[in-house]
Amino acid sequence: MYRHLFLFWKWGCYVWLMICSVLLAMGTQSIGQTIPPAQASSSTASAPAKQPYFIYGADVSFLQQMESKGIAFKDNGQVHPGLEILRHNGFNWVRLRIMNEPTPLPNTLQYSLVEAKAARALGFRILLDFHYSDDWADPAHEKTPAAWAKMPHEELVKAVYQFTKDTITAFREQGTMPDMVQIGNEITSGMLWPDGRLPDRWPQFADLLEAGIRGANDGKGAEQRPLIMIHIDQGGNDETTKWFFDNLIVNRVPFDVIGQSYYPWWQGSLNELKNNLEFMANRYKKPIIVVETAYDWRDSEDFKGRKPPYTQTPQGQADFLGMLVNTVKQTPNGLGKGVFWWEPMAEGAIAKRGMFDDHHEALPVVKVFGSAQQQ
C-alpha cells in the first residue's frame, strides 16, 4: 500500500514538473525582437521613421513641472526647451509616469497628456509607466490608491482594467498613442498591496497584471498594440530575476519586454548587470531594457562608504553612462534594446543625479547618447 502511495506521489510530482516546463517554454518563445516604430500623430501624414537599433531614453516626468516654474535649461550656454535639448543630443524615447490621484506629485492624466503631446511633436516615442498608486510605487511602497483601498479583489481587478483602458484611450484620442506600456513600476514585491503583494499572492498579482494588459490592449482602438513591459528592480541579481519571471510565466502573464532598474549603489556592479543580461537573454529570449538608471555628478553618500566605480564628477557620470550603453549592447542575440535615464531634469535631493548642473547647464552626460550613435 505504502509503495503504491509513494509511486502515485512520485508520478504526480513528475506531471507537475512537466506542466511547469511546458509553461516556461511557452513563455520564453520570442515574440519578435523589434521595438515597433513610432506612431505618427493623427494630424501628421508622413510615415513613421524606421526604428533605430537602440533606445536612448529618459524619464522626463518632472520636466513640465520645472519649466512651468520658469526654469530654463541650457546647452552650450544657449537656452532651449528641455525636450529639444534631449532630442538634439540623440534621445529618441521618453518615459512618462502616470498615477491615479497624485499629491503633491504632478503626474495626473492631464499633465501626462501635455507632456506626451510635446514629446510626440518632436518625434519622440513614448513609454507610459503606470504606477497604480497615488504616490511613488517601488519594492518598498506599492500602496493601493485611496479610491480603491477598500475594494475586494474582483472589484480591484475591474478598476485596474478600466483605469488602464481609459488612460490609453485618452492618449490615443489625442494622437499620442504610447508605443510601449509598463504595467506597474518596480513590481518585484508585487503591486496594489495588500491584494497583490508578493511572494504570497501570485494568483491575485497575476490577475491584476492581466487586467492592466487587457486594458492597454482594449484602449488602443484601431491603433497598433503597444508593447507590454514588466519592470523589476533587479538589474544585477539573476537569482531574484529568475524567481520573478519564472513565476510570471507559470502564472501565464503575457508580456513582450523585460524592464530592469540599474542603479550601481543598489543593484551591483556593471559586471553583475552583464551577467544578468546574458541570463535573461538566454532564458527568456525577449527584448531587455534598462528602464531606470542614474549616476551622481557630484559627491554623495549613495555608495555608503564603498568606493564608487567612477568618480562622482560630471565626467565620471558621463563615463558611467557610456560604459552602461556598451554593456547593454553586448547582450546576447541583440536583445539588449535600450537605456532610460531616470530624470535628467530634477530638483532637490535627486538633482545630483540629473543631467544638468545647478545653473541648469547641460553636463557632459547629455552628449553620450549622441556619441554612441556615431560609433
Report each predicted region and the residues it spans.
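Bacterial N-terminal signal peptides
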Residues: 12-25
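Boundary/entry segment of secreted carbohydrate-active catalytic domains
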Residues: 48-79
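Hydrophobic faces of well-ordered beta-strands that scaffold small-molecule active sites
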Residues: 56-58, 94-96, 126-128, 179-183, ...
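Active-site beta-loop-alpha junctions enriched in small/polar residues
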Residues: 61-63, 99, 131-133, 183-188, ...
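Aromatic-lined substrate-binding rim segments of carbohydrate-active enzymes
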Residues: 80-137, 201-220, 224, 277, ...
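Active-site cleft segment of glycoside hydrolase catalytic domains centered on the general acid/base Glu
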Residues: 109-110, 139-248, 253, 268-277, ...
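Aromatic-lined glycan-binding groove of carbohydrate-active enzymes
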Residues: 240, 249-260, 269-270, 276-301
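Aromatic-rich peripheral "rim/lid" segments of glycoside hydrolase catalytic domains that contact
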Residues: 279, 293, 298-323, 327-375
